[in-house]
Amino acid sequence: MKKIFIIAAASALFASSSFAADPTQKVLDAFSKTFKQVKEVTWQDFDNKYEANFSQNNITFRVMYDQEGNVVKSIRYYYAQNLPIFIQARLTKKYDGKKVFGVTEVTTETDVTYHIILEDAKTWTHVQSDAFGNMFTEKKLKKA
């Protein structure tokens, strides 16, 4: 099942974008200052923005820059151990008996949103949470 999560993340990564992007020097400089240890990165461009795709410490990243090298959005894909403790505690209390399957964290200038997939023996539960632990069930699916 974890493979499904990774495949879904990879598919989303490549949707509606083009390859062979040449980021501006400002973008490359900003990226290298922030992510000094990253050696393998692929770039995509769309809508006058550049997207860096890479992995670091078992977390898959998508970081979007404007042409001036400013980060406009980041998306990270990871597992339960990387969720903030506060969010983990809220999940455990509200969704007792369910296990975190995967997390998509979306960060913009004004917001951090966690899209969390939970599972138990019979269902998949998609939960959305903000940084304050305000969460709700987006959808619930029965396993086949």
Model feature map: region roles:
Residues I85-N134:
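Surface-exposed, polar helix/loop patches in the mature regions of secreted/periplasmic/lumenal proteins
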Residues V41-W43, S74, F101-V103:
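Generic beta-strand hydrophobic packing signal
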